[in-house]
Amino acid sequence: MTYHQLCARAFAALYLGLCAQAAPAASAADEAPAQPAPTVTANVTVASQYVSRGIRQSWDKPALQAGLDYVHPSGFSAGTWASTISDKFVESGTIEWDIYGGYSGAVGGVGYSALLYVYRYPSAIYRATGTKYHYSEVALGLTYQFLYAKYNRTVSRDFFGIPDARGTGYLDLGANLAVGGGHTLNLHYGDGRVAGAGNGIWDWKDGKIGLTKALENGWSVSGAYTKARGASNAYDIYTLGIPNRSGAFDVANVARGTVVLSVTKIF
């Protein structure tokens, strides 16, 4: 799940909470309080580009993103999310499709979560090794007030087109701090370690600072600066090694610092 997903889900929770507060109180004549009902929310985002864990996946092009989330009062949840991507970054791929579900709760003031994520890239395959880009992760998370920590661990054999990378880990530390006027300051630090012999060249770290503004009727806007740094130059001169129509190779620094702007609508 990406920065935009996290912002969309966090804003959805805020939006639903405000709606609940605005609802009329139950009358004293009611025999029993109504049981909390499951919630279903949808979100649509238009972003200036798609950056996931500090890496630019839409090759500097705009991205269209959408998701659907179901949350049960017991703490169980499930959802799906998709984004356009570039086939210059993912060979023969134009869509990332995520499916996820799990459980979350709280003890005292500390929140916790355990979820399974399945990432699908229809038709995408890195033909040099015959490896598909699909992979799966288990994510364990903790939250306290505006702080959060999450660790994702790859449980599939391969990781994003990299073969034999089971055990790849990504540590996500951050904060979403309300600063008044409907604004939230978004801070993030990430550390990715790719498992498997020789795969350490794909290790990376990334950081982000952003600001999200909640608007009326489920709308929000956000802006962020994000940057990554790889353990090698693999991200600085990233290429699939496939000649384009002119016979040249498409090469880009997918880790360089960049600004991402987005508009999100929660339904």
What are these regions, as identified by a protein language model?
Residues 40, 74-80, 108-114, 146-151, ...:
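Repeated loop/turn-to-beta-strand initiation elements of outer-membrane beta-barrel proteins
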Residues 1-39:
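Cleavable N-terminal export/targeting peptides
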